[in-house]
């Protein structure tokens, strides 16, 4: 109960912080809200399974439903966190595939309940792991791996210097999951997942705050902070200035101009991202 109370306090605080954020898009807020609500809901379901296990058989249905939803929704938390990585409103194909996999997994769990494949609840209302409990473990680790790879790819795309911090987070959540599987009486998984979601929120915000919203390149503030640390005895600074760009805005409008600038930035990133960092300043593009 104490761990669940801590979970709720932290998750409520994060929901308020997400709601008040002026830097997150509506899509990103929605993704974080869904993740926090799922973590809170699964934490409650875990408490319910502990409380009702072994009670009179009239509570058996509640034990089954709580275990089903807890096992079924666990991988969806990672999918929600992947959803917030992309600022675009449309769902990418990979996320749609992940959602379909989650729905298929939920259907499989539902169909397998009478056979006790992943878990079973006896007529005496006693929970036990099924012979194919490993399916849940595979889905859970698969979801974590999906989140990890998506975050690493996004951080590399955005040239985030802190992307190495992703690996300790991955190691942390995997170690606690192994401990939970080996020692099921501990019930520490969702407290650790709550902590992970907070750290992930901080990491993502730091990554996005370094970006220029229009071009996806590192922004001017990031450039100024970085140049203060550089020793000017090595390296090359390449500056790109788009000729007559004002005419594009004047003749075709600022919307078309922004699209042009974003396209140019994408070309520069493809050409130079492997060799150095790309920035967008107010007046020019810099590699």
PLM feature spans:
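Extracellular-loop-to-transmembrane junctions of the mid-late helices
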Residues: 1-7, 111-146, 180-186
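Hydrophobic alpha-helical transmembrane segments of multi-pass membrane proteins
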Residues: 3-59, 63-81, 99-116, 166-181
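Alpha-helical transmembrane segments in multipass membrane proteins, preferentially the mid-helix core
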Residues: 13-18, 80-84, 137-158
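Membrane-interface helix-boundary motifs at transmembrane edges
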Residues: 19-32, 86-96, 152-163
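Non-cytosolic membrane-interface motifs at loop->transmembrane helix junctions
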Residues: 58-68, 123-133, 189-192
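Signal-transducing coiled-coil linker helices
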Residues: 150-152, 156-214, 221-235
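Hydrophobic/aromatic micro-motifs used in signal-transmission helices and low-complexity FG repeats
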Residues: 214-215, 242-244, 252
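Conserved long alpha-helical elements within nucleotide-processing catalytic cores of c-di-GMP signaling
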Residues: 220-236, 246-269, 273, 279-284
């Amino acid at each position: 109960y104490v761990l669940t109370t801590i979970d709720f306090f932290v998750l409520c605080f994060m929901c308020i912080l997400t709601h008040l954020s002026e830097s997150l898009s509506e899509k990103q807020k929605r993704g974080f809200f869904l993740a926090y609500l799922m973590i809170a809901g699964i934490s409650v379901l875990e408490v319910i399974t502990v409380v009702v296990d072994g009670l009179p058989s009239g509570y058996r249905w509640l034990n089954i439903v709580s275990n089903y939803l807890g096992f079924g929704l666990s991988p969806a938390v990672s999918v929600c966190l992947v959803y917030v990585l992309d600022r675009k409103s449309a769902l990418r194909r990979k996320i749609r595939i992940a959602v379909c996999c989650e729905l298929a997994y939920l259907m499989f769990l539902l169909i397998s309940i009478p056979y006790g494949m992943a878990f079973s609840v006896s007529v005496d209302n006693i929970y036990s792991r099924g012979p194919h409990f490993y399916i849940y473990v595979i889905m859970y680790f698969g979801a974590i791996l999906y989140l990890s790879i998506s975050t690493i790819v996004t951080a590399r795309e955005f040239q985030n210097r802190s992307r190495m911090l992703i690996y300790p987070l991955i190691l942390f959540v995997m170690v606690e999951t192994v401990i939970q599987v080996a020692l099921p009486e501990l019930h520490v998984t969702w407290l650790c997942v709550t902590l992970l979601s907070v750290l992930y929120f901080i990491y993502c915000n730091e990554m996005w705050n370094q970006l220029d919203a229009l071009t996806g390149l590192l922004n001017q503030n990031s450039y100024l902070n970085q140049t203060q640390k550089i020793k000017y005895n090595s390296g090359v600074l390449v500056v790109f200035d788009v000729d007559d760009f004002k005419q594009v805005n004047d003749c075709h409008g600022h919307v078309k101009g922004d699209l042009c600038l974003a396209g140019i930035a994408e070309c520069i990133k493809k050409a130079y991202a492997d060799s150095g960092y790309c920035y967008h300043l107010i007046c020019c593009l810099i590699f």
